[in-house]
From Swiss-Prot:
Domain of life: Eukaryota
Function: Probable ion channel inhibitor.
GO CC terms of this entry: extracellular region
Taxonomic source organism: Cyriopagopus hainanus (Chinese bird spider)
Region of interest: Disordered: 60-83
Gene Ontology MF annotations: sodium channel inhibitor activity; toxin activity
Entry's free-text remark on domains: The presence of a 'disulfide through disulfide knot' structurally defines this protein as a knottin.
Assigned protein family: Belongs to the neurotoxin 14 (magi-1) family. 01 (HNTX-16) subfamily.
Tissue: Expressed by the venom gland.
Alphabetic keyword roster: Disulfide bond, Ion channel impairing toxin, Knottin, Secreted, Signal, Toxin
Signal sequence segment: 1-21
Secreted listed as a keyword: yes
This protein's name: U11-theraphotoxin-Hhn1n
């Protein structure tokens, strides 16, 4: 019975001592992995930041090339009444006096050329 107790005690002591060593090794491995993960995340973050800055630069270049005066101002579409003195018909449309409808209103309309 004594040999069983001694054997059990010996196995228990070995398990505890080896378990502690494994626990320390596991802790060190986890620290190394988290440090590597942080460096990888920092690298990925910097790469994403560079790509976003490049995209922003391209967008700002396109905005600077486009002038505010180059855009067409608001215009009047086809079949919409317009003022005789201020024709703002859209491109491809001309201001004409209507043939049938609109003669009662004495106004001009925008029509296709």
């Amino acid at each position: 019975m004594n040999t069983v107790r001694v054997t059990f005690l010996l196995v228990f002591v070995l398990a505890v001592s080896l378990g502690q060593a494994d626990k320390d090794e596991n802790r060190m491995e986890m620290q190394e992995k988290t440090e590597q993960g942080k460096s990888y995340l920092d690298f990925a973050e910097n790469l994403l930041l560079q790509k976003l800055e490049e995209l922003e630069a391209k967008l700002l270049e396109e905005d600077s090339e486009e002038s505010r005066n180059s855009r067409q101002k608001r215009c009047i579409g086809e079949g919409v009444p317009c003022d005789e003195n201020d024709p703002r018909c859209c491109s491809g449309l001309v201001r004409l006096k209507p043939t049938l409808h609109g003669i009662w209103y004495k106004s001009y309309y925008c029509y296709k050329k």
